[in-house]
Amino acid sequence: MTKIVRSKYKASRRLGVSLWGDSKDAFNTRNYRPGQHGQNTMIKTSDYGLHLKAKQRLKCYYGRVTEKQFRNTFALAQRMQGNTGENFIGLLESRLDTVVYRMNIAPTIFAARQLVSHGHIKLNGKKADIASIRLKEGDIIEIKESIQQIPLIQESIAKQGQTTPKYLSFDVSSLTGKYLRVPALSDVPYPFEAEVHLVIELYSR
């Protein structure tokens, strides 16, 4: 088990949810915080603590996006027309690494980011190696031929149709995906309750 895998499972226990819905997640059998006092249920969380935890869960879920990137995404969502929470999630879901993960090209958000940063993903026919690139409606994602037969990729692609959201499409025969539209919050398949309103309240203070 790699350090990233151990670390992400520990994050699930620390934040009190199975962040990625993984059956191997230690939170499923030890649903309390790690450490000596992890099973102490008498510890009360302040209002600020609840807001902070909601933010930390989302940051971890999207592959530990940096605080600067997260705050800048919120600032952009605030400037856009419409509901800030919906805008915020729409921006996070339009990131290239997130879309690669959602299309089941990679088994985890961390693996998706690695594929992008190593130049294994094409965006509209050109190499794209920046994970935070935001996609637009109609953008096309391709997997480079050099990695198409890697077992990990093949195993992930085999899940097509099971969990691919409706705002994306993926053609298994050509290994090509399409970003169809910006999703609504209700479209996003979070494995836990994403309390986006608490994140918005925290950043709006």
Swiss-Prot record:
Coiled-coil stretches: none
Pfam families: Ribosomal_S4, S4
Annotated Gene Ontology cellular component terms: small ribosomal subunit
Residue ranges crossing the lipid bilayer per the database entry: none
PROSITE patterns recorded: RIBOSOMAL_S4 (PS00632), S4 (PS50889)
Gene3D superfamilies named among the record's database cross-references: Ribosomal Protein S4 Delta 41, Chain A, domain 1, RNA-binding S4 domain
Entry annotated with the keyword Ribosomal protein: yes
GO biological process, one term: ribosomal small subunit biogenesis
InterPro entries, alphabetized: Ribosomal_uS4, Ribosomal_uS4_bac-type, Ribosomal_uS4_CS, Ribosomal_uS4_N, S4_RNA-bd, S4_RNA-bd_sf
Assembly and binders: Part of the 30S ribosomal subunit. Contacts protein S5. The interaction surface between S4 and S5 is involved in control of translational fidelity.
Function: One of the primary rRNA binding proteins, it binds directly to 16S rRNA where it nucleates assembly of the body of the 30S subunit.
Protein name: Small ribosomal subunit protein uS4
